[in-house]
Curated annotation (Swiss-Prot):
Annotated function: Molecular chaperone; assists the folding of proteins upon ATP hydrolysis. Known to play a role, in vitro, in the folding of actin and tubulin.
GO CC annotation terms, alphabetical: chaperonin-containing T-complex
Gene coding for it: cct-4
Family matches, as InterPro entries: Chap_CCT_delta, Chaperone_TCP-1, Chaperonin_TCP-1_CS, Cpn60/GroEL/TCP-1, GroEL-like_apical_dom_sf, GROEL-like_equatorial_sf, TCP-1-like_intermed_sf, TCP-1_chaperonin
Protein source organism: Caenorhabditis elegans
Name of the protein in question: T-complex protein 1 subunit delta
Length: 540
C-alpha cells in the first residue's frame, strides 16, 4: 500500500499540470488577439493627428539622414519602421487605399483603429470574434448602400465642380496655399488624357511629372507636349529645332560588342588604323541612315550593356544638325511614343520617315543652376498624354508638392471611375453612424451590439477633424449628430469657421469612391485581424 501513495500524488500533479496547460492554451488566443489590436491601434494613433486640413505634419528621418516632412498617411506609414506583423497590415491597408483611390490613406487607417477599439470592447463583453467579424461585414455593406443614397451624380464637363474636389484634397497638404494653381492643373491634365464620355479609368502614367528645384511652386506649369529630363548631347549640337522630326530608337549608336568574350589581338599600327576606320565607318553609316530618314531630333533609350551613343557618333550627329537626347528610361518609352506620335525602332534597318513624330518646336530650356530640360511643343497628332513641370524652392517642398498633386490627380481619377460625390467634413461617416444605429434595432442578439459599435467607431472621423482643428470634439460631434438625426445629411465639421455647416454650400466635397473604399478596406482589414488567434514562427 505505501508505494501507491506517491503514485497517486504523481497522477494528481500530472492532471493538475494538464489542466493548467489547457487553461493556458485557452487563454493564448485572447492574449494574441489583444496584442494584435494594441499594435495596430498604435499605428493608427500615430497618424490620427495628421487627419484633416488642420492636421499636423510629421518629420521622418531615414537612416542615411534624409528628412521628409509630410502629412500624407501613405508616405508616413511607408517610411515608418514597423516591426509587429499586425501593425504591418495597417501599412499594407494604407497602400491598398492609395492604389484603389489615391486619397483617404490617413482616414482608412484611423477608421481601422477605431473599429479595432470597438472590437476590443465587444470581445471584453464575451462576444465571439467570428460574430463580430460577420457583423462588421454586414454593417460595412449597409454603409456602402447609405453612401450611394446620399451621393450626388457628377458631370465631368463641370470644371468648376472638379476644381472644388481637387481643392478639397489639397487643403490638408503642406502646399495648400497653392491649391488655386495645382487643382486646375490636375483637372486639366486628367481631362486631356481621357474621353469623358466613354472612359471609366485614368492611366496616370500618361501624365509625366518632372520635378526641378528652383523658383516656387507657383512657377509650375502644365505643358501640352513633352518634357524630357535630359540635356542635349554633343559639343556644337543644336539646342533648338523648329519643325522637328522626332525619332525614338532602342538600339545603340556605338561600336558593337561580340556576344562572347573574345579577344582581338592587334600587332601593328596598320591593323589598329583599320580597326578604327571600320568603327568610324560603322557609326557614320548609322548616322547617315538616320539623317536620310529626315530625322533632326533623336531620342535614344538608355542601355546597360554599352554606351547608348559614343563621342564619335555625337560628333557626326552634331555635324548633321541632329539634336541628340540619350538615356531615355525604358519605362518612359511608351509615354514618349504616345505623346510625340513616333514609333520606337529597335533596328537601324527599320528606321524610316514613317517612324517619326512631328512637332513645331523642340528646345532646351534652363530650370535654374545647371538644370535643363527639353521641351517639345506643337506636337502634330499627339496622343492622350501631358507633362507637368513642378517647381519648388527646396527638396522638401518639391517632394510634398509632388505627393499633393498626385493625390489631386487621384481624386479626379476617382470621379472618372465612379461618377458621384459626397459632402466632406466627416458628413458621410456621421450619416452612416446615425442610420446604422437606427438599423441596429432591426438586428437580433449580439449583431445589434456590433452594429452599434461599428456606428460609434465611425464617429471618430468627425471627432478627430474637430480635435485637430482645436474645436471641442464632444460638443462638435454632438451638434453634428443632432443635425444628421434631423435629416441634414450634408452637414459636416467646418474647420475654417469653427462650427458645423452644410459642406456642399461650403464647396467641401469628395469622391464617393474614396469614402466607400476606405470603409470597405478598413472593415476587411479588421476582420482579418480578429480572425487571428496565434502567431507561429515559420522555419527559415
Amino acid at each position: 500500500m505505501p508505494p501507491a501513495v506517491p503514485a497517486a500524488a504523481a497522477t494528481a500533479r500530472q492532471s493538475a499540470s494538464g489542466r493548467e496547460r489547457n487553461f493556458k492554451d485557452k487563454d493564448k488566443p485572447e492574449s494574441v488577439r489583444n496584442s494584435n489590436i494594441v499594435a495596430a491601434k498604435a499605428v493608427a494613433d500615430a497618424v490620427r493627428t495628421s487627419l484633416g486640413p488642420r492636421g499636423m505634419d510629421k518629420m521622418i528621418q531615414s537612416g542615411n539622414g534624409d528628412v521628409t516632412i509630410t502629412n500624407d498617411g501613405a508616405t508616413i506609414l511607408n517610411q515608418m519602421s514597423v516591426i509587429h506583423p499586425t501593425a504591418k497590415m495597417l501599412v499594407e491597408l494604407s497602400k491598398a487605399q492609395d492604389i484603389e483611390a489615391g486619397d483617404g490613406t490617413t482616414t482608412v487607417v484611423v477608421m481601422a483603429g477605431a473599429l479595432l477599439d470597438a472590437a476590443q470592447n465587444l470581445l471584453s463583453k464575451g462576444i465571439h470574434p467570428t460574430t463580430i467579424s460577420e457583423s462588421f461585414q454586414s454593417a460595412a455593406a449597409e454603409a456602402e448602400k447609405i453612401l450611394d443614397e446620399m451621393s450626388s451624380p457628377v458631370d465631368l464637363s463641370n470644371d468648376a465642380l472638379l476644381n472644388k474636389m481637387a481643392t478639397t484634397s489639397l487643403n490638408s497638404k503642406v502646399v495648400s496655399q497653392h491649391s488655386w494653381l495645382l487643382a486646375p492643373m490636375a483637372v486639366n491634365a486628367v481631362k486631356k488624357i481621357i474621353n469623358s464620355e466613354n472612359d471609366s479609368n485614368v492611366n496616370l502614367k500618361m501624365i509625366k511629372i518632372i520635378k526641378k528645384m528652383g523658383d516656387t511652386v507657383e512657377e509650375s506649369e502644365l505643358i501640352e507636349g513633352a518634357l524630357i529630363d535630359q540635356k542635349t548631347m554633343g559639343r556644337g549640337a543644336p539646342t533648338r529645332i523648329e519643325k522637328a522630326k522626332i525619332g525614338l530608337i532602342q538600339f545603340q549608336i556605338s561600336p558593337p560588342k561580340t556576344d562572347m568574350e573574345n579577344q582581338v589581338i592587334i600587332t601593328d599600327y596598320a591593323q589598329m588604323d583599320r580597326a578604327l576606320k571600320e568603327e568610324r565607318q560603322y557609326l557614320l553609316e548609322i548616322c547617315k541612315q538616320i539623317k536620310a530618314a529626315g530625322c533632326n531630333v533623336l531620342l535614344i533609350q538608355k542601355s546597360i550593356l554599352r554606351d547608348a551613343v559614343n563621342e564619335l557618333a555625337l560628333h557626326f550627329l552634331a555635324k548633321m544638325k541632329i539634336m541628340c537626347i540619350k538615356d531615355i528610361e525604358r519605362e518612359d518609352i511608351e509615354f514618349y511614343s504616345r505623346i510625340l506620335g513616333c514609333r520606337p525602332v529597335a533596328s537601324v534597318d527599320h528606321f524610316n520617315a514613317d517612324a517619326l513624330g512631328y512637332a513645331d518646336l523642340v528646345e532646351e530650356i534652363p530650370t535654374g543652376g545647371d538644370g535643363k530640360v527639353i521641351k517639345v511643343t506643337g506636337v502634330q497628332n499627339p496622343g492622350h498624354a501631358v507633362s507637368i513641370l513642378l517647381r519648388g524652392s527646396n527638396k522638401l517642398v518639391l517632394e510634398e508638392a509632388d505627393r499633393s498633386i498626385h493625390d489631386a490627380l487621384c481624386v479626379i481619377r476617382c470621379l472618372v471611375k465612379k461618377k458621384a460625390l459626397l459632402p466632406g467634413g466627416g458628413a458621410p461617416e456621421m450619416e452612416i453612424a446615425v442610420k446604422l444605429r437606427n438599423l441596429a434595432q432591426t438586428q437580433h442578439g449580439a449583431t445589434q451590439y456590433c452594429w452599434r459599435a461599428f456606428a460609434d467607431a465611425l464617429e471618430l472621423i468627425p471627432y478627430t477633424l474637430a480635435e485637430n482643428a482645436g474645436l471641442s470634439p464632444i460638443h462638435t460631434v454632438t451638434e453634428l449628430r443632432n443635425n444628421h438625426a434631423n435629416g441634414n445629411s450634408s452637414y459636416g465639421v467646418n474647420v475654417r469657421k469653427g462650427y458645423v455647416t452644410d459642406m456642399v454650400e461650403e464647396d467641401v466635397v469628395q469622391p464617393l469612391l474614396v469614402t466607400a473604399s476606405a470603409i470597405k478596406q478598413a472593415s476587411e482589414c479588421v476582420r482579418s485581424i480578429l480572425k487571428i488567434d496565434d502567431i507561429v514562427m515559420a522555419v527559415r
